[in-house]
């Protein structure tokens, strides 16, 4: 590989890592802001908005409505799914550009992964006999309002499984818009590692570390060590399997649907913006804004 090609591949990877950081900031804070807004509508007094959590319910608010008790814990995952479908329509209807398309694709996958992921994993996280304030997971808390109804939990588990498989499907299908020769395994590996593997690995490590400065970690490190890896590592596993399917495991698509490769030019402003956003997360958003 020539130095020019090595440089182009490095720039493609760095650009996609930066886009992955931006995509995460278009996903997790939206999830938490939905919690916050729903809690306020329900009549509760929010305490904090942070990258990894939002607004503990004020017990004095005395929310009696079963509907709002469910909504303030379950609505954020639903919002992720709705946004995911909106972004998927944008992906299908518009060609976008060599930077905007990977960004929209990553953000779509993250919203779907977060939304459907809660349905899937909270089936297992639900504790029928939790201690005070230790029920883990948004939808585990929803199930608590229905006394852990098994039929509801199984239904949501199935929806979650289908949703995560849908993320795998999106990852596989959409990747070929960036691959000019579907039969070139090296190109498939190069593109899939840039748009899926490296952003996944960097985000999983970086956001787990920066969230160590967040309210959940400070309040209960044991809870954090359960929740954060589940969300950042296992919750976004669609990126890893997207890479594996495209580069190694699944026979490539016969039909060529190539638009263009992800941007392989040096985008210093993009890198600086992503680094500044990450610094903002670490210094301000992860510790949280208190009301």
How would you describe each model-predicted region?
Residues 95-291:
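N-terminal low-structure segments adjacent to metalloprotease catalytic domains
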């Amino acid at each position: 590989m020539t130095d020019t090609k090595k440089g182009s591949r490095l720039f493609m990877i760095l650009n996609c890592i930066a886009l992955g950081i931006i995509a995460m900031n278009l996903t997790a804070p939206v999830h938490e802001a939905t919690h916050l807004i729903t809690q306020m509508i329900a009549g509760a007094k929010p305490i904090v908005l942070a990258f990894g959590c939002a607004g503990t319910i004020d017990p004095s608010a005395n929310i009696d409505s079963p509907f709002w008790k469910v909504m303030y814990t379950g609505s954020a995952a639903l919002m992720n799914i709705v946004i995911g479908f909106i972004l998927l329509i944008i992906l299908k209807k518009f060609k976008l550009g060599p930077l905007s398309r990977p960004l929209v694709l990553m953000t779509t996958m993250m919203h779907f992964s977060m939304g459907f992921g809660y349905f899937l994993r909270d089936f297992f996280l639900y504790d029928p006999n939790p201690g005070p304030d230790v029920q883990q997971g948004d939808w585990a808390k929803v199930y608590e309002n229905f006394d852990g109804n098994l039929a509801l939990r199984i239904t949501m588990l199935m929806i979650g499984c289908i949703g995560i498989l849908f993320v795998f499907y999106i990852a596989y299908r959409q990747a070929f818009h960036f691959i000019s020769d579907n039969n070139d395994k090296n190109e498939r590996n190069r593109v899939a590692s840039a748009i899926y593997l490296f952003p996944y690995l960097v985000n999983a490590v970086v956001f787990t570390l920066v969230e160590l400065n967040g309210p959940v970690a400070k309040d209960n490190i044991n809870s954090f060590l359960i929740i954060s890896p589940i969300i950042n590592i296992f919750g976004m596993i669609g990126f890893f399997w997207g890479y594996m399917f495209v580069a190694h495991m699944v026979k490539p698509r016969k039909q060529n649907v190539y638009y263009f490769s992800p941007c392989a030019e040096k985008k210093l402003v993009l890198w600086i913006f992503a680094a500044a956003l990450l610094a903002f997360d670490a210094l301000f958003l992860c510790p949280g804004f208190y009301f």
